[in-house]
Structures are given as structure tokens and as C-alpha cells.
């Protein structure tokens, strides 16, 4: 086992950092701060951060094949023009639910942008239940709705053979799997592959590694856990010096580093004194496993 090193590479003070995505061409980490309505890009070489503020909560960001990015802003799928710091709406969901917003999102191997919604929280993880749904934005900009009755639509990724879709609805305390049809984007046969233990708290963001194992950030649990979705066993726990770990992705040279986002919202002054790096961006090295490159939206 190589020795694991955890460092806060960016003391960003995110209210709720989320959706880390590695952009190989710029050696940068993209991420969002949801309630601050910001999309951020941290250059791993210069250590500089560029921030773009939107007009509604920004819950996820993804790469786009034609250049620029796509993001979920409020209840809208948007295209982002980074240079002009502007967003163009591609589609809107949940028109009948004025209190909803998007949460986590990610692009599938065919270039569709998957993202789910939730009711706006009154406090972290406190919200009206069953208000959310899971959607995907196809490259032609039409939207498919998969299911509703979601509490907090969260982590998502696809198996290495693209035949399984993994998904987290946080308040189910479960990591679920679906059969996945890459050609059509259809999902079926939902089942649980891992139930979180009490001390692991709330499952949040998720990514897959090059060995097909899942990494889940545990909100209020201060850790990321590595799971085998085939056996349902937890293989590894990596604890961080902050409680409110929100999401994770691989990046850096050969995708050998893990980046973890976290939150400050909901912490009292004493907690912030105890965890001064809360809201920062963390880099974990020495895991001994690599990730895979993120997919880009094809529209």
C-alpha cells in the first residue's frame, strides 16, 4: 500500500463545493459553489482560480466537446461561455416546482448530460421530501425524465463497460445500480449495491476508478469510501480533516490524484475553528489507483 497524503490545495471557503471535474487540456480542476452561484476553475500549475458568478445556484459543471462547458443552474441545463462569463439556456425542467433546483450532474459515455433535482434546502440535508427527479439532456437538447420521487439527487457514474449506471439519492443512504443501454440512454432494474453504515453518514458525490470500483464522498462523515459494486463490500476508507465532504473526482497526471470538495454551510463557529480548511479543495495522492477521464457533453 502506498502512503496516502491529503492536502488542502485551495482554501476556497466554499459554502458548498461540489461537482469537481478535471480538465486535462488546461491542467485545471473545475468545481462549483452551489449557494454562492459560482463556477470555479483552479489551474494546478499556476494555482490561480477563476470564478464566474451566475444568477442562480450552480450545482454541477461538465466539459463540452465543442468547447466551453455545460452546467446546471437553478432548474436549467445551460451552455457556459467561459471567456464571456455568460450562460445560454439549453433546456428547463421542473417548471411546476418553483422551489426546486438541480443538484449533482455528470456526462455519460455517449455525451448525454445527466442531472437530478431536489427541493431547495431549509438547512443542509433538511428539505421537502420526494420533490426531485432524474433527467438527462441529449446532444440534440431534448430532455428525458427517468423517474421522480427523489429526495436529494446526487452522485452518478457509469461502469467501465458502460452497461451499468450507478446513482445516489442521498436520503436513501444507498448506492444504487441500474442496467444501462448506452445506445438509447435507457435505465432499468434498479437495485442497491451498498448501504451506508451509520458513521459514514450521508452519501453524496461519487466517481469510478480504472478498476471499476466506486468512490463515494460521505457528507458529515468526513471521508471518501471505496466500494466494490459487485460484492457490495467497502474496500477502503480515507478520512479527511473536514466533516462535510461532498464529492470527488480523479485528476492530475494520468488521473492518479483524487480531488475532494467540501462544504462550510451548516457549521457553527466552533466547528469552523476546529476545521479551518472546511470549504477547501483537497488533493489525495498515493491511493495506488487511477481514475478515468471525464466524458464531454456532445451537444
Swiss-Prot record:
Catalyzed reaction equations: D-glucono-1,5-lactone + H2O = D-gluconate + H(+)
Cystine bridges: none
E.C. no: 3.1.1.17
Cofactor note: Binds 1 divalent metal cation per subunit. Most active with Zn(2+) and Mn(2+) ions. The physiological cofactor is most likely Ca(2+) or Mg(2+).
A Pfam cross-reference name: SGL
GO cellular component, one term: cytoplasm
Modification type N6-succinyllysine: residues: 144, 244, 253
Protein name: Regucalcin
Gene name of the encoded protein: RGN
Amino acid at each position: 500500500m502506498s502512503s496516502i497524503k491529503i492536502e488542502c490545495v485551495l482554501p476556497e471557503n466554499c459554502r458548498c463545493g461540489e461537482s469537481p471535474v478535471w480538465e486535462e487540456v488546461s491542467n485545471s480542476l473545475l468545481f462549483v459553489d452551489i449557494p454562492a452561484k459560482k463556477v470555479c476553475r483552479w489551474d494546478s500549475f499556476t494555482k490561480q482560480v477563476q470564478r464566474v458568478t451566475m444568477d442562480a445556484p450552480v450545482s454541477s459543471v461538465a466539459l463540452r466537446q465543442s468547447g466551453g462547458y455545460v452546467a446546471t443552474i437553478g432548474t436549467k441545463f445551460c451552455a457556459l461561455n467561459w471567456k464571456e462569463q455568460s450562460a445560454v439556456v439549453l433546456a428547463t425542467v421542473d417548471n411546476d416546482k418553483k422551489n426546486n433546483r438541480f443538484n449533482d450532474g455528470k456526462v455519460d459515455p455517449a455525451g448525454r448530460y445527466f442531472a437530478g433535482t431536489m427541493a431547495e434546502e431549509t438547512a443542509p440535508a433538511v428539505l421537502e421530501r420526494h420533490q426531485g427527479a432524474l433527467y438527462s439532456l441529449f446532444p440534440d437538447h431534448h430532455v428525458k425524465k427517468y423517474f421522480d420521487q427523489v429526495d436529494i439527487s446526487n452522485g452518478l457514474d457509469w461502469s467501465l463497460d458502460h452497461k451499468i449506471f450507478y446513482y445516489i439519492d442521498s436520503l436513501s443512504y444507498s448506492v444504487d445500480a441500474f442496467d444501462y443501454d448506452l445506445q438509447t440512454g435507457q435505465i432499468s432494474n434498479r437495485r442497491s449495491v451498498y448501504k451506508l453504515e451509520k458513521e459514514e453518514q450521508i452519501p453524496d458525490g461519487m466517481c469510478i476508478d480504472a478498476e471499476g470500483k466506486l468512490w463515494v464522498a460521505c457528507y458529515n462523515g468526513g471521508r471518501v469510501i471505496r466500494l466494490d459494486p459487485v460484492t457490495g463490500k467497502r474496500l477502503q476508507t480515507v478520512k479527511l480533516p473536514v466533516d462535510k465532504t461532498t464529492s470527488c473526482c480523479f485528476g492530475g497526471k494520468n488521473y492518479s490524484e483524487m480531488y475532494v470538495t467540501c462544504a462550510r454551510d451548516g457549521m457553527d463557529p466552533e466547528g469552523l475553528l476546529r476545521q479551518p480548511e472546511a470549504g477547501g479543495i483537497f488533493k489525495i495522492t498515493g491511493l495506488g489507483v487511477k481514475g478515468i477521464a471525464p466524458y464531454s457533453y456532445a451537444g
